[in-house]
């Protein structure tokens, strides 16, 4: 709550809903996205783009989901207790400050532990490959701005390999 008070401009409110309080039509047509930082926490800190990179990532993912006629209205954390606990909150706050729509936050732990790779998540264990994947980074590569990437892969292992290589390219 204190973080929200310091980061939010103007007033804010928190509404809590149980899934059975949300109309079935909305549940069937609304999606949530896991937002997380991928790469070295030390490099992310050095780059100083922790929050804005998350917004670029979310923007890429929204575009990827539109290709599948799906809209994202909620964010959730890929892991609780580590750095990625804060990512959905920061993305929601920064996106709103940049004039974006309000993004809801889902309060649950998607994995119950730290997730070192995309292919070690509970989604992957249940057979749901991270597809599509939206990546965002603010640094430039060879003078060209490379802020958004959309990746469509068949398997979680492919997604992980491509995402890790892009982290190397973006020096994150």
Segments predicted by a language model, with ranges:
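A structural-propensity feature for long, helix-poor, extended segments
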Residues: 27-40, 120-166
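Short, acidic/small-residue loops that bind anionic groups at enzyme active sites
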Residues: 94-119
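Glycine-rich oxoanion-binding loops at beta->alpha junctions
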Residues: 22-71
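Flexible, glycine/charged-enriched surface loops at secondary-structure junctions
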Residues: 13, 169-172
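A short, small-residue-rich loop immediately preceding and capping a beta-strand
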Residues: 71-83, 101-106
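Buried hydrophobic packing segments
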Residues: 3-4, 61-64, 88-95, 163
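Short glycine/serine/threonine-rich phosphate/pyrophosphate-binding segments
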Residues: 1, 55-58, 77-89, 111-117
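N-terminal low-complexity or amphipathic/hydrophobic leaders
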Residues: 1-33
């Amino acid at each position: 709550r204190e973080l929200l008070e310091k980061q939010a401009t103007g007033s804010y409110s928190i509404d809590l809903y149980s899934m059975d309080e949300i109309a079935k039509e909305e549940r069937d047509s609304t999606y949530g996205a896991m937002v997380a930082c991928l790469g070295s926490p030390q490099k992310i800190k050095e780059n100083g783009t922790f929050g804005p990179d998350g917004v670029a990532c979310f923007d890429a993912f929204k575009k990827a989901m539109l290709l599948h006629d799906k809209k994202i209205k909620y964010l959730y954390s890929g892991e609780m207790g580590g750095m990625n606990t804060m990512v959905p909150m920061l993305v929601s706050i920064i996106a709103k400050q940049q004039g974006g729509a309000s993004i809801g936050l889902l309060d649950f732990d998607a994995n119950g532990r730290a997730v070192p790779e995309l292919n070690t998540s509970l989604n992957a264990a249940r057979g749901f490959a991270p597809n599509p994947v939206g990546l965002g980074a603010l640094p430039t590569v060879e003078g060209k701005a490379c802020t958004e990437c959309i990746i469509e892969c068949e398997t979680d292992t492919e997604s992980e390999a491509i995402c890790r290589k892009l982290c190397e390219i973006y020096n994150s």
